[in-house]
Amino acid sequence: MDNDIDATAGKHLRGKYAVVGVGETGYVRGTDCNTRTLATRAVRAAMEDAGLSNLEVDGMLSYSNNDSTTSPLVAGDLGIRLNFYMDVYGGGSSTEALIGIAMGVIEAGMCNTVAIFRAMNGYSQVRIGGTGGAGTRAPLSGGGLFGRAYGLMSAGQMFSQSFMRHMYDYGTTPEQVAMVKVIHSEHASNNPKAYYKQRVTVDDVLSSRMIVKPLHLLDCCVETDNGTAIIVTRIDRARDCRHTPAAIQSVVGRCSKPRADNHYQAGPISTVAGHYAKDILWPNAGVGPEDIDATGSYDAFTFTTMLQLEDYGFCKKGEGGDYVSSGVTRLGGERPNNTSGGHLCEGYTHGINMVIENVRQLRGDVDDSCPVGPDGKRQH
């Protein structure tokens, strides 16, 4: 017996569910709000965006690194009586994973409409990118035993090994990958919500101080305080909501290695989970990379965007440096990426603001940074 998934099975849920509401607080550095307040405000904003009352939401999901609030508290603040909730310890891909879980629990009849949130004081309190958080102190277990003894305490330190390996194997250069920051800064300059709106150059990136080779300061995301939320429901309910629903065509979860300590296990270390997930993702969605007009990537670092776009099949393995430096991902290019500025410029939300941005793109709500085709019309 194996664990292979039949990507063409009739059980897939293509087009049966949609994101109907999105909400967020400001992306700031320094707030007088705790994460409970941020989450409550974000979920309320998403409900208002969808045109839903507290009586019409009955499920709630969230993720954190033990740095946030819980669903029952937020639901209580909003007067929501929950039929289902779950709070998970998650990472950068948890938004998409929880979208899949929301679809599953609705399909199972456990609830009807699910709010998903991430709230974090990622600058003023728990800074994921630093080395002084609670997770860096003893006692350690699991993957932490492999890395912490050698000084691998931050995400940048751990990811840098993958980036260096890609440079070694394929000749990728920091100059090429710096274009990710350049392009995302161009997009953020159009976005009034972005924390960093200033455009930068490749020289700006490479002359910023070194954090851990090959990452310079401007290769790294912008730590911010924020709350963000989305709402998922069935497509038939979605049509009664305030905006055109953003239909969900496919959701896939896949780990690249059995354990989180990616660099201490067999197999390539410069390949991300998208390499393994794409053969399920695309058939389930009924489209391929060539059909996509705009993308959203988890840009915790410039290099992570490059690896994701490569491993999801937008270019061949080893050609990611050429792809991101070609201009294809900027507004006016063939396939704009992170049109709000992403984590590198709009603000770090642990993965959810790219989903919010793409929902707005699909609805045509983003006049200042919406991809525009040669004929002047929006293309989605």
Which residues does each predicted region cover?
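Short acidic, glycine/serine/threonine-rich loops at helix termini
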Residues: 31-32, 125-131, 189-193, 259-261, ...
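Active-site-proximal alpha-helical scaffold in enzymes
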Residues: 90-120, 156-190, 230-236, 345-366
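Conserved active-site "lid/cap" helical segment
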Residues: 2-93, 101, 105, 162, ...
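Extended C-terminal subregions enriched in glycine
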Residues: 267-302, 311-314, 343-347
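Short glycine/threonine-rich loop-to-helix capping motif typified by GTGT followed
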Residues: 66-77, 260-265, 299-322
